[in-house]
């Protein structure tokens, strides 16, 4: 037993640390193998990944195709090929749309950059896709010019309507001023061009094109719409809807159906819109029934409206808008990509005034991605021109089923079902065994390292204690926050379809189309994680800077107040970054209720990821990725310099009485790499698009970085002579206590003269220290181990 106590304690410590490292590495490899095997034996999904072709997506049991394709699997062409007509060249054009020419107006003209002409792709009476004649525009006439012409009547309505259609062909280039001018022009065409039906049909195409502009542009246009051009356009189109006999006009974003009834017609008219393979409106999906007795929705119904007049009327009209962009509300805010359809029913005003009982019944089957959204509530509303906003007066809910939302209103105008959704977030599972073990070992290692560095400061006489303690402290706090706070407590909140607000008395307009469950504690955790991880990287950079001055610049003593300066940088700069980030997001959100989700994610309490690859507005990019990337590039540069000039090369400033072993150099290199945070470069490998490679790097990244605290403990605490000496004393004390408690045998031992020799040889110390040869008043030493 005495011989065992004389064993070199470093061997025992090395064995223990080796076992811990081996266990963690083994768990990591085991988890990686399991994950790869799971990736190989993936169960066959009910719908193959490539079932929907040509950009189609599988939603709610069917393929949603792009405008260029149709059919069950989006395999039937629905566009006109590239074409040339005279001097104009056109790309592919979806059916029902006008395609802009590739030739644009020259610089210096009023419409510089706008297409010179458009061309309609349509379906003939025989079902063939064919191109129509080219419509030319003028490069010296813009929408503001058309406003003047329509007011002064200096040009025909047909010419003005044609010019407006060409100018709005590329909706992505429309500004708020363009939207306001275009709606003004089109509204006056409907009001003044009494006998020019072609001008009005072209104007409908213009409205459809305008509705392709972004929601942000429409919101800005509504703010500057002092003349109420939106309201005027809506009213004029209502009047147009019942004045065209039995004519149907269908554009991708708007459909109009006029109905003329006779004595054989019933008291009700049913207008239906059926689902299709794309989100655009097409003529085959618009149905009318003059003798309907009630609503009769089926699985293909997207919406229906039943107009009850009580007695036969000569004319009525229906209209459906693909989205709500013309109806800019001050009480209801649209923030998601979901398209709120608007449906309108209208009868002649003079006849309506004599009508005592006019009612409208509606049924909606909203199309949205049920994998991402869950319906929370809805309201049956109409557009009130007096307040220029949505109103619920005279409208009520009449119950709903699993698919359909039903409404009833006592008047006719533009109706909608304003829906609010809760996003169906996919909350991640709790940390697995590997992450928990790695974090637990790191937390324990960091805590022991901090205590050791503080308690043995005077004994070791090293100049890096404060930097290492600050680094370990920030890393320790980050690990604790990560383990106990990264998960959002909202994941435990359960919602179901029974939560939908369907009570008639609760017909209240929602504030937004997206409902979020606020969680200020999660936002606070995200801010703290953001701060302490930035602090960790900042101290990584300061550690690299300090070693650079000590080893490469041989700057001893360090500048006066150096510790105070780096402390202000290490703890203060990250606080400024986090504070500016949160303050900027809050200021830019305006009156947005759920501004915090612009800063953090809902799935976990961490920085928000870019939406639609919009990295320019992502806090993750500006307040984390860029600062961390700068620090890592600097650290790696310094790491390479120190490795080449100090660790793996004989330095003239260092003296040693023995040869430095390769093992010693490896440990010194690893020590610096860990403190510099070099392993974080593996995070960039996780951006690889290949799933298998990304998974491998993800596990390697987690393995190295969750155990970073353990690595620091082994390399900066366990390997020091002070720790080994204290650990040796503790082991000897425990061994002595064990010997005293061990019962002695009852047999009296023979008294023999025995001489014992200790044949174990102590291993040579691998801990290197150096002093500068220049005289200095400083007596501190710098250790790389």
From Swiss-Prot:
UniProt KW Transmembrane keyword: yes
GAIN-B domain: residues covered: 271-425
Gene Ontology terms describing biological process: cell surface receptor signaling pathway
Transmembrane segments: 436-456, 466-486, 524-544, 562-582, 624-644, 669-689, 695-715
GO cellular component: membrane
Summary of the tissues where the protein is detected: Selectively expressed in the intestinal tissues.
InterPro entries: ADGR_G7 (IPR053066), GAIN_B (IPR057244), GAIN_dom_sf (IPR046338), GPCR_2-like_7TM (IPR017981), GPCR_2_secretin-like (IPR000832), GPR128_7tmB2 (IPR047938), GPR128_GAIN_subdom_A (IPR053985), GPR128_GAIN_subdom_B (IPR053986)
Glycosylation sites: 82, 122, 133, 152, 159, 178, 195, 239, 289, 348, 400, 408
Domain of life assignment: Eukaryota
Membrane topology label: Multi-pass membrane protein
Residues annotated as signal peptide: 1-26
Family: Belongs to the G-protein coupled receptor 2 family. Adhesion G-protein coupled receptor (ADGR) subfamily.
Function recorded in the entry: Orphan receptor.
Name of the protein described by the UniProt record: Adhesion G-protein coupled receptor G7
Species annotation: Mus musculus (Mouse)
């Amino acid at each position: 037993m005495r011989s065992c106590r004389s064993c070199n304690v470093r061997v025992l410590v090395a064995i223990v640390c080796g076992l811990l490292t081996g266990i963690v590495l083994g768990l990591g490899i085991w988890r990686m193998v399991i994950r790869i095997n799971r990736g190989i034996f993936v169960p066959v999904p009910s719908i193959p990944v490539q079932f929907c072709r040509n950009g189609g997506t599988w939603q709610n049991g069917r393929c949603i195709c792009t405008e260029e394709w149709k059919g069950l699997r989006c395999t039937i062409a629905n566009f006109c090929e590239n074409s040339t007509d005279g001097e104009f060249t056109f790309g592919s054009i979806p059916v029902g749309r006008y395609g802009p020419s590739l030739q644009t107006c020259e610089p210096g003209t009023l419409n510089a950059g706008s297409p010179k002409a458009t061309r309609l792709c349509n379906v003939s009476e025989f079902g063939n896709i064919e191109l129509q004649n080219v419509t030319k525009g003028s490069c010296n006439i813009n929408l503001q010019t058309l406003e003047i012409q329509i007011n002064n009547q200096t040009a025909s309505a047909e010419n003005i309507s044609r010019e407006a259609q060409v100018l709005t062909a590329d909706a992505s280039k429309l500004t708020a001023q363009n939207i306001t001018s275009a709606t003004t022009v089109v509204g006056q065409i409907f009001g003044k061009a009494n006998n020019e039906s072609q001008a009005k049909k072209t104007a409908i195409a213009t409205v459809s094109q305008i509705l392709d502009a972004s929601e942000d542009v429409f919101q800005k246009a509504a703010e500057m719409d002092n003349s109420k051009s939106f309201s005027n356009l809506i009213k004029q189109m209502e009047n147009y809807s019942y004045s065209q006999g039995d004519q149907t006009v269908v554009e991708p974003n708007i459909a109009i159906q006029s109905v003329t009834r006779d004595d054989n017609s019933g008291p009700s008219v049913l207008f239906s819109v059926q689902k299709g393979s794309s989100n655009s409106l097409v003529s085959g999906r618009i149905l009318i029934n003059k003798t309907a007795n009630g609503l009769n929705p089926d699985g293909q119904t997207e919406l229906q409206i039943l107009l009850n007049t009580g007695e036969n009327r000569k004319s009525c009209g229906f209209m459906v808008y693909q989205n709500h962009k013309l109806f800019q509300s001050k009480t209801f805010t649209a923030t998601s990509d979901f398209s709120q359809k608007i449906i309108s029913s209208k009868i002649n005003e003079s006849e309506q005034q004599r009508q005592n009982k006019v009612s409208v019944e509606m049924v909606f089957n909203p199309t949205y991605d049920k994998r991402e959204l869950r319906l929370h509530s809805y309201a049956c509303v109409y557009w009130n021109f007096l307040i220029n906003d949505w109103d619920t007066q005279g409208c009520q809910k009449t119950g709903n089923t699993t698919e359909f939302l039903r409404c009833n209103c006592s008047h006719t105008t533009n109706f909608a079902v304003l829906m609010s959704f809760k996003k169906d977030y996919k909350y991640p599972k709790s940390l697995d065994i590997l992450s928990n073990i790695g974090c637990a070992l790191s937390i324990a290692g960091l805590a022991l390292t901090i205590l050791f560095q503080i308690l043995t400061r005077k004994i070791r006489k090293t100049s890096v204690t404060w930097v290492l303690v600050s680094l370990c402290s920030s890393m320790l706090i980050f690990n604790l926050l990560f383990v106990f706070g990264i998960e959002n407590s909202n994941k435990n909140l359960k919602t179901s379809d029974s939560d939908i607000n369907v009570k008639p008395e609760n017909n209240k307009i929602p504030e937004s189309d997206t409902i979020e469950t606020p969680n200020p504690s999660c936002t606070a955790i995200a801010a703290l994680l953001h701060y302490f991880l930035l602090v960790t990287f900042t101290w990584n950079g300061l550690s690299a800077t300090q070693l650079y001055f000590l080893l490469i610049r041989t700057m001893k003593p360090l500048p006066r107040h150096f510790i105070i300066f780096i402390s202000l940088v290490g703890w203060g700069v990250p606080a400024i970054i986090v504070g500016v980030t949160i303050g900027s997001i809050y200021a830019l959100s305006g009156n947005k209720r759920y501004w915090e989700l612009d800063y953090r994610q809902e799935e976990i309490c961490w920085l928000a990821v870019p939406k639609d690859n919009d990295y320019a507005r992502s806090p993750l990019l500006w307040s984390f990725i860029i600062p961390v990337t700068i620090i890592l590039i600097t650290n790696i540069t310094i790491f390479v310099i120190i490795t080449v000039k100090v660790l793996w090369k004989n330095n003239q400033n260092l003296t040693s009485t023995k040869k430095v072993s390769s093992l010693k150099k490896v440990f010194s290199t690893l020590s610096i790499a860990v403190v510099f945070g070099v392993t974080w470069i593996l995070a960039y490998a996780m951006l690889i698009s290949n799933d298998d490679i990304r998974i491998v790097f993800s596990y390697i990244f987690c393995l190295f970085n969750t155990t970073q605290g353990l690595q620091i403990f082994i390399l900066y605490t366990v390997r020091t002579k002070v720790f080994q000496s204290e650990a040796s004393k503790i082991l000897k004390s425990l061994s002595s206590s064990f010997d005293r408690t061990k019962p002695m045998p009852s047999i009296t031992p023979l008294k023999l003269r025995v001489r014992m020799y200790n044949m174990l040889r102590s291993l040579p110390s691998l801990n290197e220290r150096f002093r500068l040869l220049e005289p200095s008043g400083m007596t501190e030493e710098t250790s790389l181990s």
